[in-house]
Amino acid sequence: MGIKGPLLSGALGSAPTLAAVLRWTEGRSPVVVIGPPWLGDAVATAGRVLVLVEPEVRPVALRARRRAHKQSRALDVALAAAELPLGRATLPALVVENVGGLQDDEAARWLAALVPCLRPGGRLIAADATSSTAAAARVAGAFLSAALSEIVQEWPRDGALLTIGVAPTASIVAARFGAPTAVDELLPGEPRNFK
C-alpha cells in the first residue's frame, strides 16, 4: 500500500492521488509545495521539499517537519507571504493546491506570479479536490494563460484532479511576465524574497 494523507484529507490524500503526484515530481528536487503540510510531507517521501504555509498553519507544519526529519525525509517549512524564498527560474517543480477553487482572475494572477519561479522545463502541478469538469476546464485555462505548455489533466480517482504544465523558455517568460529585475540578473539562482 502506498503513502496516503491524513484521515480527513479526502480524495487528494488518497494513495492513488499521492502516487500520481510523486510520479509527476519524480527526479525533480527540490519541490516546493504550496498547500497543506501533509501534502508536503507526502511528497518528501521521494525527495527534498519546501512547504509554504500560511501563518495559522505553521505550528502544524513544524510538527510535520519534525516527524519527517525523524524519518530521514527532507522537509522544510516557510511562511508563504513573509518568507517566500523563490527566485526567478530556480524551481524544478512546484505543487499547488486548490487552483480550481479560485476565481478565474485570481487563478490567472497567482499562476502568473508562480510560473517565472520555475526553471524552463520545470513542472507546475495543481492538485484540486473536485469532480467538476467545469473546474477542470477553468484550471486548464489558467495554465494556458500562464504560458504553460504540455498541459495534462489526470483524475487519479474520483474527486481528485491533477493538472500538470511545463514552464516555458526564459525568452517566453520575459515576454509574457516581464524582464528579470536587477536582483535577478545580479544573483541568478539565489533564493530571495518573492513579491
Stretches with model-predicted labels:
Residues E83-V96:
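A short acidic, Gly/Pro-enriched loop at the edge of an enzyme's catalytic core
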Residues I3-P30, W38-A42:
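Conserved alpha-helix/loop element of class I SAM-dependent methyltransferases that forms part
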Residues T25, A44, C117-R119:
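A generic alpha-to-beta junction signature in SAM-dependent methyltransferases
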